[in-house]
Amino acid sequence: MFKPTVGPIIGHTTTNHARIFLRGKLQDTSLVFAGVRYRRLGEEHWSRGEFVKLTIVRDMSDVIALNELASDTEYEYQAGWFSPMSPVHTVETVQELPLQWPRDIYRFRTQSSKITTPRAYIVGSCRYLRMTAGIPSAPHLGDRIFASIAHLAQRTEPPISATLMTGDQIYVDDLNVIAPDREYKEILSKYRIAFSQPNISKLMSGTPTYMILDDHEIEDNWPANKSKTDDYLYKNAIAAYELYQASHSPAHELLSDGQISRKLEQYWYQFANGDIEWFVTDSRTRRNLSADDRRILDEEQEQALCKWLIHSPARVKFVVTSVMFYPDRKTLGDDAWKAFPEQRLRLLETIRTHRIKNVIFVSGDVHGSLTSRLTHSKDPDFEVHTIVSSPLCNSKLLPYAKASTFILDQPLAKTAAGDYRHELTSQVVSQDNFAHLVVDREHIQVNYHDRDGKPLQTINIPLA
């Protein structure tokens, strides 16, 4: 067996289930299989291998489901791919082969079943990896922050429950106005290179990783900048996104037989860790830019989000939106929620009128990090917070956001019932960074770190 050419990536992980993405390699006309075997840390004997047949339709990649795991337990696993001599093998018959597994042993931990135990998360976005003629130039620049994240994840308590990558995991357009990538094979190559750099590979092989797309997975400011010829680009970019980012997410349903459904109804999804729940929105591909019904989330998604906000018993509710919910930018804000004020106000009024507590909006996009509190002039019980974490690695062509980037001296929205007012609760971080969140009974601690892992600032968001 050979090491995966991309991965393994630990995706959606629960108390008893984990998803592992990996890619092999095309072998002319020969069959190719990928496999995973695992054991509890400290045990001697490996499980039987779980195998999947790889096909060119999925770029020789797939996701393997591990089921009936024990909660809050550390597992070791091995992963690899091979091409058997016989052309008639199946995923059942290859289990009997005397395979020599790759030496690398990876680890992951299942989620705790304790409802109120403290949880920790990593949040980041916008990882620029410069490509020239299909070859990464100075790839270590786009990878080094992941060494710092992996180092933190290995030594911190409570253990990291998940890494949230909230958009622009790759730059399909590469900030290239003259000749951006449009072909499917070019976009696939970008994913392979971006996700196989050593430090991000190490992090994703051991920490459950959840992703959602933003514009650069397609093109800058999509769909506002869409041209008549961009349907071809969109089809290719989305097909690659579905393989490399959505495939291991909860957007794919787990079937009763323990397999992952191939069907993908939408890109938005939910997941839960004890009394903490996440609703990861697709704020990019379901937009409606028409004047009579402008919306950043389609109607089905908005209804699902409001239903979840109102009825979920979760103590803490994180809403991920790849673009900023608030505060608004003074310029270049039309790609974010600023340009969709009616829908934003509907969400805020839902939270306020139903008296929903501990709602946190999490986003990236702006190449600056901050926390901010939103209050209401006539309703002292209303409070919402936002956590922004961006970028993991900036391009030298793009500026970092500063406090002066944002509109902070006027209400976010004015209504007959009162004004929504916001204020920064942190400094604005204007450098490459990531956020380490720790959620306990009393508060959410937001720790921003620079690309070398050094602490930049800590903010405590009180919980009701």
Where are these regions (language model features)?
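Metal-dependent phosphoester/phosphodiester hydrolase catalytic core
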Residues: M1-A464
